Amino acid sequence: MEIPLQEQESSLKSSNEPSSSTSEPVVNTQGLDNQGEEILSQLYRPLKACDNTCYCKKCCYHCQLCFLKKGLGICYDRSRRRSAKRAKTTAPSAPDK
């Protein structure tokens, strides 16, 4: 029950050649790469202004900007400088002698 030499060589050649089933996942990973790039581009694009002032759960999560401002409390606006607190001038009740 020996296999002829030609059949052995042909079976070796077919195992060395890339099969069509291995090329299909490459196409799928390219699709995943494109999807990943699309998600990243959405993350880095500037956020659009939203004038919604409601703080209910539905409004806090309806867009990314509202989630950052209302849900997490993060605001990147320019912070105003606080004015120095004025010291209260009190008259000395007992003069030092």
Swiss-Prot record:
Keywords for the protein's UniProt record, in alphabetical order: Activator, AIDS, Host nucleus, Host-virus interaction, Phosphoprotein, RNA-binding, Transcription, Transcription regulation
Keyword flag RNA-binding: yes
Disulfide feature: none
Compositional bias (Low complexity): 14-29
GO molecular function, one term: RNA binding
GO BP of this protein: positive regulation of viral transcription
Post-translational events: The phosphorylation by CDK9 does not seem to be important for transactivation function.
Ranges spanned by the short sequence motif Nuclear localization signal, and RNA-binding (TAR), renumbered to the chain: 78-88
Disordered, as annotated region: 1-32
UniProt region (Core), positions on chain: 67-77
Pfam families cross-referenced by the UniProt entry: Tat
UniProt subcellular location: Host nucleus, Host nucleolus
Major site of localization recorded for this protein: host cell
Keyword Transmembrane: no
Comment, domains: The Arg-rich RNA-binding region binds the TAR RNA. This region also mediates the nuclear localization.
Described purpose of this protein according to its UniProt entry: Transcriptional activator that increases RNA Pol II processivity, thereby increasing the level of full-length viral transcripts. Recognizes a hairpin structure at the 5'-LTR of the nascent viral mRNAs referred to as the transactivation responsive RNA element (TAR) and recruits the cyclin T1-CDK9 complex (P-TEFb complex) that will in turn hyperphosphorylate the RNA polymerase II to allow efficient elongation. The CDK9 component of P-TEFb and other Tat-activated kinases hyperphosphorylate the C-terminus of RNA Pol II that becomes stabilized and much more processive.
Family (UniProt): Belongs to the lentiviruses Tat family.
Quaternary structure (record): Interacts with host CCNT1. Associates with the P-TEFb complex composed at least of Tat, P-TEFb (CDK9 and CCNT1), TAR RNA, RNA Pol II. Interacts with CCNT2; the resulting complex is unable to bind to TAR RNA.
Record's protein name: Protein Tat
Organism of origin: Human immunodeficiency virus type 2 subtype B (isolate D205) (HIV-2)
Biological classification of the source: Viruses, Riboviria, Pararnavirae, Artverviricota, Revtraviricetes
Gene designation per UniProt: tat
